[in-house]
UniProtKB/Swiss-Prot annotation:
PROSITE patterns, alphabetized: ALDOLASE_CLASS_I
Modified residue annotations for N-acetylserine: S2
Role of this protein: Fructose-bisphosphate aldolase that plays a key role in glycolysis and gluconeogenesis. Associates with GAPC1 to the outer mitochondrial membrane, in a redox-dependent manner, leading to binding and bundling of actin. Actin binding and bundling occurs under oxidizing conditions and is reversible under reducing conditions. May be part of a redox-dependent retrograde signal transduction network for adaptation upon oxidative stress.
Subunit field text: Homotetramer. Interacts with TRX1 and TRX3. Interacts with GAPC1 and VDAC3.
Record's protein name: Fructose-bisphosphate aldolase 6, cytosolic
Keyword Transmembrane helix found: no
A GO BP entry: cellular response to hypoxia
Knockout-associated phenotype: No visible phenotype under normal growth conditions, but mutant seeds have increased germination rate in presence of high salt or high mannitol, and decreased germination rate in presence of abscisic acid (ABA), glucose, fructose and sucrose.
Pathway participation: Carbohydrate degradation; glycolysis; D-glyceraldehyde 3-phosphate and glycerone phosphate from D-glucose: step 4/4
Gene this protein is translated from: FBA6
Tissue expression summary: Expressed in roots, rosettes leaves, cauline leaves, stems and flowers.
Cell cycle as UniProt keyword: no
């Protein structure tokens, strides 16, 4: 039983439930300056503040897109940015019924005593930062822990360390009014089969919920952002129905019914793959006490980015590409995606990056 008694408890529960509204999901636009620089470089656009702002403004002002979203995760820079007409992005999102979120981790560092496994930094001063972000309008937060599958990985040490880091982050967020998104990402890198991924996912999620319980985290005021259960990147692909079955079973075995929603990361899948897999999960006839939705970054932005190319004259077309993906994923949260989205440039290409750094 959680003994959590934050003054924010009712607000946390309401906001977590709202983010998990079927038909809506999260746009992850919280790429660090370095990561968004790589995205911009792929379309030959310079990584300067004005270009980063232009890309985010393109996304946030797309007609018809925001009704498909319940939240947008921002990088600290974007939390304080304004659109070209002077409207703060936070106000723009809130007026459209979209909750602003904030990435609060400080990236990964190697975990001593392991074979290249990592732990996530950012707990120092986290309470003060959360307080500041809440005052700036943020209502949820994200912290990414990263695990990998190998012959002996993930080690028990890495699982424990990352689970407890996520739990400490979660309770600090809740003390300061932010709904924590708990993100234990198991990288798709490797040649393992889907059964191996399922077994590891179950181990990791079980450890996370034990840690959250130990820290008295209010589960009704949290969200889970896991990987889908898939074969490794060097293995043969399987059908969306197979991914759906293995993923939902792993979640049934480990995620308490008190959690309102599970928002999947795309993990380097192509835009279309990620949507089809989410749709298959929502079509599955089985027990699902939580809503199943999306928190996609690359899988919502790739075709938009390619279409835009940094050119003002392409903004309208790029926004049309973004709307296509938003609508497709909105339908997938209802199990209603027909696979008929007009595929923009790059929509079918794998977005996998080995050992991905966010």
């Amino acid at each position: 039983m959680s003994s959590f008694t934050s003054k924010f408890a009712d607000e946390l529960i309401a906001n977590a439930a709202y983010i998990g509204t079927p038909g809506k999901g999260i746009l992850a636009a919280d790429e660090s300056t370095g990561t968004i620089g790589k995205r911009l470089a792929s379309i030959n656009v310079e990584n300067v503040e004005s270009n980063r702002r232009a890309l985010r403004e393109l996304l946030f002002t797309t007609p018809g897109a925001l009704p498909c979203l319940s939240g947008v995760i921002l990088f600290e820079e974007t939390l304080y940015q304004k659109s070209s007409d002077g409207t703060p992005f936070v106000d723009m999102l809130k007026s459209a019924g979209v909750l602003p979120g904030i990435k609060v981790d400080k990236g990964t560092v190697e975990l001593a005593g392991t074979n290249g496994e990592t732990t996530t930094q950012g707990l120092d001063g986290l309470g003060d930062r959360c307080k500041k972000y809440y005052e700036a309008g943020a209502r949820f937060a994200k912290w990414r822990a990263v695990l990998k599958i190998g012959v002996n990985e993930p080690s028990q040490l890495a699982i424990h360390e990352n689970a407890y880091g996520l739990a400490r982050y979660a309770v600090i967020c809740q003390e300061n009014g932010l709904v924590p998104i708990v993100e234990p990402e198991i990288l798709v890198d490797g040649s393992h089969d889907i059964q191996k991924c399922a077994a590891v996912t179950e181990r990791v999620l079980a450890a996370c919920y034990k840690a959250l319980s130990d820290h008295h985290v209010l589960l009704e005021g949290t969200l889970l952002k896991p990987n889908m259960v898939t074969p490794g990147s060097e293995s043969a692909k399987v059908a969306p129905e197979v991914i759906a079955e293995h993923t939902v079973r792993a979640l049934q075995r480990t995620v308490p019914a008190a959690v309102p929603a599970i928002v999947f990361l795309s993990g380097g899948q192509s835009e279309e793959e990620a949507t089809r897999n989410l749709n298959a999960m929502n079509q599955l006839k089985t027990k699902k006490p939580w809503s199943l939705s999306f928190s996609f970054g690359r899988a919502l932005q790739q075709s938009t980015l390619k279409t835009w190319g940094g050119k003002e004259e392409n903004v309208k077309k790029a926004q049309e590409a973004f709307l296509v993906r938003c609508k497709a994923n909105s339908e997938a949260t209802l199990g209603a995606y027909k696979g008929d989205a007009k595929l923009g440039e790059g929509a079918a290409e794998s977005l996998h990056v080995k050992d991905y750094k966010y």
